[in-house]
Amino acid sequence: RGLGDVYKRPELYQAYNTLFEKHWEEQTGQKVRIIQSHGGSGKQALEVANGLDADVVTLALEGDIKTISDSGLIDPGFTSEFPDDSAPYTSTIVFLVRKGNPKQIKDWDDLLRSDVSVITPNPKTSGGARWNYLAAWYYFEGQGESEEDITEHMKTLYQNVLVLDSGARGSTTTFIENGQGDVLIAWENEAFLSMQEEPGEYEIVVPSASVLCQPTVAVVDEVVDRRGSRAVAEEYLNYLYSDEAQKLAGENYYRPADQDIAKQFYTEEGTHAVSYTHLTLPT
């Protein structure tokens, strides 16, 4: 049986798919082949809504899945279909800077400086980029700024963006491989992966305010009912909450929804933004 999967992060799901294929065969005796599509969350949502057959979607934010739901492909109430508002893991927004932090970037207001060039994806195509936008807005709102002033700050910030890639991975490539920009606004897991892949070349800066990002998962009801794949699709998403999959999420620098497993990967560091945690690099 084939399972079409539109997803957010290639490394996590490449490993998870192997885990799930083994699990499904052990449980049912059936082999399953998972066909994947990866890209900016907003763009992926539009492609599914416009006819790309996917049995399941794992996207950056609830709103992208609502786009598919609004097209009639996913039943309303999808956030209650799985535990933790159908978010099996979470992340937050941090800054990735080059070794030594040469521009001394500490917080969101530093991204408004004329000498700082920023890399972040395009909020029109990337769900992750919308979390970046919200985190910046949240910071300025916390400074007591008016909506008018915050809007001007956001304009300034985006005027400092060198390249608006369509997705988070494209922005990481622009910053890491192409060497463009002074700071990458990134999901925590993306920042840690970059540090793992290029040891000693980058540093993570934790801004004073951020947001808790909740990637959402859903079964595409119209597709699974038409294809007769509901059982495997639902189990694919349910198994994300298994101990094995939760550990895999932590190993890929996400914050597992299972708090007992999450504790294996973080140390507490409080801020006023969220109940903030730092994932430590797995040994």
Residue ranges: model-predicted function:
Residues 8-11, 41-44, 63-66, 101-102, ...:
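Solvent-exposed loop/turn segments at secondary-structure junctions
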Residues 1-71, 81-82, 187:
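Early extracytoplasmic/lumenal segment of secretory-pathway proteins
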Residues 69-142:
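A conserved helix-loop-strand patch within extracytoplasmic ligand-binding domains
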Residues 2-6, 278-283:
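Short, small-residue-biased leader/transition segments that mark boundaries at the very start
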Residues 143-208:
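Ligand-binding pocket segment of bilobal, Venus flytrap-like solute-binding proteins
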